[in-house]
Swiss-Prot record:
Record field: compositional bias (Low complexity): 41-72, 345-366, 428-453
Role according to the record: Inhibits PRC2/EED-EZH1 and PRC2/EED-EZH2 complex function by inhibiting EZH1/EZH2 methyltransferase activity, thereby causing down-regulation of histone H3 trimethylation on 'Lys-27' (H3K27me3). Probably inhibits methyltransferase activity by limiting the stimulatory effect of cofactors such as AEBP2 and JARID2. Inhibits H3K27me3 deposition during spermatogenesis and oogenesis.
GO MF annotations in UniProt: histone methyltransferase inhibitor activity
Residue numbers spanned by region Sufficient for interaction with EZH2: 401-409
Subunit structure: Interacts with PRC2/EED-EZH1 complex member EZH1 and with PRC2/EED-EZH2 complex member EZH2; the interaction blocks EZH1/EZH2 methyltransferase activity. Interacts (via C-terminus) with SUZ12 which is a member of the PRC2/EED-EZH1 and PRC2/EED-EZH2 complexes.
Effect of mutating M406A: Does not act as a substrate of the PRC2/EED-EZH2 complex
InterPro entries: EZH_Inhibitor
Stretches the record annotates as Disordered: 1-72, 97-462, 483-503
Compositional bias ranges of the Basic and acidic residues kind: 1-16, 97-107
Gene (UniProt): EZHIP
Keywords attached to this entry: Cytoplasm, Nucleus, Phosphoprotein
GO BP of this protein: chromatin organization; epigenetic regulation of gene expression
Region (Necessary and sufficient for inhibition of PRC2/EED-EZH1 and PRC2/EED-EZH2 complex activity) location: 403-423
Name the UniProt record assigns to this protein: EZH inhibitory protein
């Protein structure tokens, strides 16, 4: 089990070995670290690597790297965590602070303090708390190889933490140019990318790249979700402006998804804020789904920088209503023009259908109305004639009765064949089809036309009287029997003119 004294001996031995060849490069790399000409040519960068011993302790072996590793101004501490099995990577970054005048060493290398309790030392990045002025630096001078804790601005927190706690490097002070407080702990490839290049801009770069990727994922996911959720109004809005509006919209669809990926860092925000108004101005008008869809990519950068968001919103408010009104008009015009063919076709078809129905109903009512009209005219003619001469109505009625019979308005076939009396019976039945109440009122009008009461078959309209049937079927039989001469004359006069129109 390695103790702290063994580690200090090993570090002293290896530092004395590799100190001569590294002085010039490290002095060139970090000569201006603490302000005004405070350059120590004997400072060196040590890479501290720890291997977890089986008993649970961490054996730290400090070795000075070659010229390529010495040229870099940062090193990494890899500590394997036995509980999770994953290595905890901490960036040991040498920072340049031009505003610190009280630093007495050009290099600030964070060492790993191993607690005595046998547990592992976990070194990771410190979360951004409010104590930006505390900075714990362990420096190494060329003549003195033992470690000395030195506070740079104020009195630092004690370095010895309880067993199992972590020592975290402090973030950049707010006065440094690339300072951006990040609430995300640096882990994985971001710290290795931080360790590749010197300078404080890497912290801001990595801390910007991480919420940028997260916001990019949310942007693409929200855009795809909005596009998948509301395809109807979007399609309607796309087809509402035919011609140049569709490729214009297609070119603005791609920067909404590609601009977060193409432009990194603050340039991405500056570039994303430029197509924001145009995209939102050209897309927000035609439909509420597209307006809601474009409000998500605009509101995502608005959380990061509220001033460009408000400026963009103020910039949007000017072309927004005009475009909205104009495209709403064009959309309403297109919707009216697109719906008027449908409604026009629908109304035209309904008009044609209603015209056909009304024509049929008119023709049907005309077909029924002429029958009842002719029947009423016939009845009126017969009642108006009122003469005992039966020849006049019998000769005038058969052609009209033939037309009624061709329309098949008689309810039963005996009306077609039994000629003398069903003439009057057909008239009354056809008029009773058109208006049922008119036949009983007109039936007394038939009484002057028929001289004898036997021919009044209107009392039973559905079934003619058997006497009238006998008269119609067997005139010869009734000719043998004694019949009054006026009845015989009427039978002959009604039977003979009605037979020619028989089909």
């Amino acid at each position: 089990m390695a103790t702290q004294s063994d580690m200090e001996k090993e570090q002293k031995h290896q530092q004395d070995e590799g100190q001569g060849g590294l002085n010039n490069e490290t002095a060139l790399a970090s000569g201006d670290a603490c302000g005004t000409g405070n350059q120590d040519p004997a400072a060196s960068v040590t890479t501290v690597s720890s291997q977890a011993s089986p008993s649970g302790g961490a054996a730290l072996s400090s070795s000075t790297a070659g010229s390529s590793a010495a040229a870099a101004t940062s090193a990494a501490i890899f500590i394997t965590d036995e509980a999770s099995g994953l290595p905890i990577i901490a960036a040991v970054l040498t920072e340049r602070h031009s505003d610190r005048q009280d630093c007495r060493s050009p290099h600030e290398v964070f060492g790993c303090v191993v607690p005595e309790g046998g547990s592992q030392a976990a070194v990771g990045p410190q979360k951004a708390t409010g104590h930006a002025d505390e900075h714990l630096a362990q420096t190494k001078s060329p003549g003195n190889s033992r470690r000395r804790k030195q506070p740079c601005r104020n009195q630092a927190a004690p370095a010895q933490k309880p067993p199992g706690r972590r020592l975290f490097p402090e973030p950049l002070p707010p006065s440094s140019p690339g300072f951006r407080p990040s609430s995300y702990p640096c882990s994985g490839a971001s710290t290795s990318s931080q360790a590749t290049q010197p300078g404080p801009a890497l912290l801001s770069h990595a801390s910007e790249a991480r919420p940028a990727t997260r916001s990019r994922i949310t942007l693409v996911a929200s855009a795809l979700r909005r596009r998948a959720s509301g395809p109807g109004p979007v399609i309607r809005g796309c087809t509402a402006q035919p011609g140049p509006a569709f490729p214009h919209r297609a070119t603005h669809l791609d920067p909404a998804r590609l601009s977060p990926e193409s432009a990194p860092g603050p340039a991405r925000r500056g570039r994303a804020s430029v197509p924001g108004p145009a995209r939102r101005g050209c897309d927000s008008a035609p439909g509420p789904a597209r307006r809601g869809r474009d409000s998500a990519p605009v509101s995502a950068p608005r959380g990061r920088d509220s001033a460009p968001g408000s400026a963009r919103r103020g910039r949007d408010s000017a072309p927004g209503p005009a475009l909205r009104v104009r495209t709403a008009r064009s959309d309403a015009g297109h919707r009216s023009t697109s719906t008027t063919p449908g409604t026009g076709l629908r109304s035209r078809s309904t008009q044609q259908r209603s015209a056909l129905l009304s024509r049929r109903s008119l023709s049907g009512s005309a077909d029924e109305n002429p029958s009842c009209g002719t029947g009423s005219e016939r009845l009126a003619f017969q009642s108006r004639s009122g003469s005992p001469d039966p020849e006049v109505p019998s000769r005038a009625s058969p052609p009209v009765w033939h037309a009624v019979r061709m329309r098949a308005s008689s309810p039963s076939p005996p009306g077609r064949f039994f000629l003398p009396i069903p003439q009057q019976w057909d008239e009354s039945s056809s008029s009773s089809y058109a208006s049922n109440s008119s036949s009983p009122s007109r039936s007394p009008g038939l009484s002057p036309s028929s001289p004898s009461p036997e021919f009044l078959g209107l009392r039973s309209i559905s079934t003619p009287s058997p006497e009238s049937l006998r008269y119609a079927l067997m005139p010869e039989f009734y000719a043998l029997s004694p019949v009054p001469p006026e009845e015989q004359a009427e039978i002959e006069s009604t039977a003979h003119p009605a037979t020619p129109p028989e089909p």
